[in-house]
Amino acid sequence: MNNHSETESSGHNSVHGNNDNIPGWNEELELAFSAYKGLYLAGRISSRHKTVCEVLVPGAVVQAGISGALQRIGKQPVVGDFVVLLDQPETGSRMVVNILPRRTCLSRGAAGDGGGEQLIAANLDTIFIVTSVGKDLNLRRLERYLAIVYSSGASPVILLNKIDLADDPARLVEKIRDVTGDVPVIPLSALSKTGLDALGPYLNPGETVALVGSSGVGKSTLINAFLGETVQKTADIRKDDEKGRHTTTVRQMFLLPNGAVLIDNPGIREIQLGDSAEGLEKAFSEIVDAARNCKFKDCTHRNEPGCAVLQAVRDGIIPEERLESYHRLTDELSFQSKKAEIGLKRLEKERYREMAVNIKKYRKFTGKP
């Protein structure tokens, strides 16, 4: 984590201190942590490397492992989590033993056949969805981002970067607003620092902002601009397809001079929705509003008589592409849900199979029938 605290590099020094020095700490977290005494520390995950976390504690950044008990119950800390550490001075180590209640949590559907959710970051106030002028500006992708951001509980803001490359930035902003409704859309150039002042209202002391977007849209350049120094590597866009190279490989927290927190994320290649039903409704609010006037409560807005949504499309109120995108994403959400259910059933079968094998081994060992 880039901050103004001391980073512990060796040895084991006492880092107990005032929890109010942890960015984002509040009374609710203090109450939740009050049950822990003695060798326990409060902290916030600033980066995660497989089984090791960097944790911001009062006055320092320390390394900590993840307890086996947490791993066994499937609780995995992510960047932005407030956690409880067991401080073990006799061994010179620290261990994350619990995760304090999350206010918000950004996730997406996990890749693979098992379904489920992949957690990205926690305790976010605002999420900057970063896109850029050129081939990355994809309205359908923005709809996906909005669905997962709304589901997280955080507030979305869309940043249109590299406006210095656009002939008519205002037209592009209007194009985005046609599908994002009331979501703020801010045109800027991270490289020339044009438009960065408009982000000030979202970067308040103690508040946390995450940046998400494809590789090459300028997230790392934005981080560097906010901090006033080069802390994140940047890379050129490939000229043949305008796609970016991954320069950020781990999620990482940065502390701004005013006390605001930024979380940078690697470029997301594939945005699977996961459990984003509520977010999908907010991302397509005009369709949900029109659907209240449909003749049938279970209307799918495909071919039913008396469908108010289809009528709104015919009247030019709702663009046909929006409805097509809504259908595509709701179908995907249904598929993801079924996939997750199948994955759980498969896991349950494997668990019973393992139990049966263990019982058989036990009976053989004890000689019992």
Curated annotation (Swiss-Prot):
Q: What are the record keywords, sorted? A: Cytoplasm, GTP-binding, Hydrolase, Metal-binding, Nucleotide-binding, Ribosome biogenesis, RNA-binding, rRNA-binding, Zinc
List cofactor names only.
Answer: Zn(2+)
> Which of the seven top EC classes does this enzyme belong to?
hydrolase
A molecular function GO annotation: GTP binding
Q: Which residues form the CP-type G domain?
A: 116-271
Entry note: cofactor: Binds 1 zinc ion per subunit.
Decide whether keyword Cell wall biogenesis/degradation is in the record: no
- UniProt binding sites for GTP: N161, K162, I163, D164, G213, S214, S215, G216, V217, G218, K219, S220, T221
Show the PROSITE patterns listed in the entry: ENGC_GTPASE (PS50936), G_CP (PS51721)
Q: Which domain of life is it from?
A: Archaea
Record: residues binding Zn(2+) = C294, C299, H301, C307
Annotated Gene Ontology cellular components are: cytoplasm
Which GO biological process entries does UniProt record here? ribosomal small subunit biogenesis
- Family per record: Belongs to the TRAFAC class YlqF/YawG GTPase family. RsgA subfamily.
What is the role of this chain? One of several proteins that assist in the late maturation steps of the functional core of the 30S ribosomal subunit. Helps release RbfA from mature subunits. May play a role in the assembly of ribosomal proteins into the subunit. Circularly permuted GTPase that catalyzes slow GTP hydrolysis, GTPase activity is stimulated by the 30S ribosomal subunit.
PANTHER family cross-referenced by the UniProt entry: SMALL RIBOSOMAL SUBUNIT BIOGENESIS GTPASE RSGA
Query: Which HAMAP family does this entry report, sorted A to Z?
Result: GTPase_RsgA
Q: What is this protein called?
A: Small ribosomal subunit biogenesis GTPase RsgA
Provide the gene name from the record: rsgA
